[in-house]
Each structure stands twice: as C-alpha cells, then as structure tokens.
Amino acid sequence: MAALPDKDKLLRNFSRCANWEEKYLYIIELGQRLAPLSPEEYSVQNIIQGCQSQVWIVMAQDPSGIITLRGDSDAAIVKGLIAVVFILYDRMTAQDIIEFDVRPWFEKMALTQHLTPSRSQGLEAMIRAIRAKAANIS
C-alpha cells in the first residue's frame, strides 16, 4: 500500500494534472492507496449518512492524542475524496480537526466546482461526520 502524500504535495500533484480527467484519475489513485477496512469495520456506526454512495469512516486516537482515520466507499471517486479528506486531517488531534477548515484547501484545488452536487453533498457529510466523531473524542 503506497503512502498518501502530505497536504502540500497533494496540492502540487493536483496542480500538475493537465485537465480534470487527469485530476479525477489522480483522486481515484489516492483512493486505491487507502488501507482496507476489516469486515467488522463495515458496521452501522461507521457508515456516513448523507452520501449517495456507501461510505464508512473509522476514527481512532493514539496514546499521544493523534487521530487516525480509515475509510472506504463502494465508489472509486468517492473513495478518492475520502483519501483527500484524510490527507487534510493527517496528524491532527481531535481538537485540531474540529478547528481546521478544509474548505480553503478544496478551493485551492478547485475541487467543489468540479464535483456533481451529490458528490459535494457527500463530501460535506463526510466532513461533518469526521468533525462530530472528533468532538465525541475530545
């Protein structure tokens, strides 16, 4: 499983894509890098409501307070969007996640204007769910 890039490398790689077809392919590639979930993790408590596709997100906190996120989707582009969100929240504490606004990063990537309305709504649902889970941990 290849490692995900950090925020800055994500932005650089995204800006190097020549067009939106390449950007979508890059997003799909990022999703393929996510570690698989265990069968038990495909549970009701990990499913994200408000997404047209099936989305599961698992959150854990290590002893130093850093949050780890793992997830999956039955749709390739959505799985890639999960990876993008995880990159943005990487190495953060629960409080950091609550306070961090991912939207400026999406604007830098011009992501939201190139997603269908249902994918944009699903992306917002993922962010809300991650922030809510972080609030329950902190």
UniProtKB/Swiss-Prot annotation:
Please give a single GO biological process term from the UniProt record.
Answer: iron-sulfur cluster assembly
* Gene Ontology cellular component list: cytoplasm
Q: Where is the active site?
A: 51 (cysteine persulfide intermediate)
Q: In which pathway does it act?
A: Cofactor biosynthesis; iron-sulfur cluster biosynthesis
Q: Which Pfam families match?
A: SufE
Q: Which InterPro entries match?
A: Cysteine_desulfuration_SufE (IPR023939), Fe-S_metab-assoc_dom (IPR003808)
Q: Write out the annotated subcellular location.
A: Cytoplasm
Q: Which UniProt keywords apply?
A: Cytoplasm
Principal localization? cytoplasm
Q: Which family does it belong to?
A: Belongs to the SufE family.
NCBIfam families per record: PRK09296.1 (NF006792)
Quaternary organization: Homodimer. Interacts with SufS.
**Role:** Participates in cysteine desulfuration mediated by SufS. Cysteine desulfuration mobilizes sulfur from L-cysteine to yield L-alanine and constitutes an essential step in sulfur metabolism for biosynthesis of a variety of sulfur-containing biomolecules. Functions as a sulfur acceptor for SufS, by mediating the direct transfer of the sulfur atom from the S-sulfanylcysteine of SufS, an intermediate product of cysteine desulfuration process.
Q: What is this protein called?
A: Cysteine desulfuration protein SufE
Origin organism is: Klebsiella pneumoniae (strain 342)
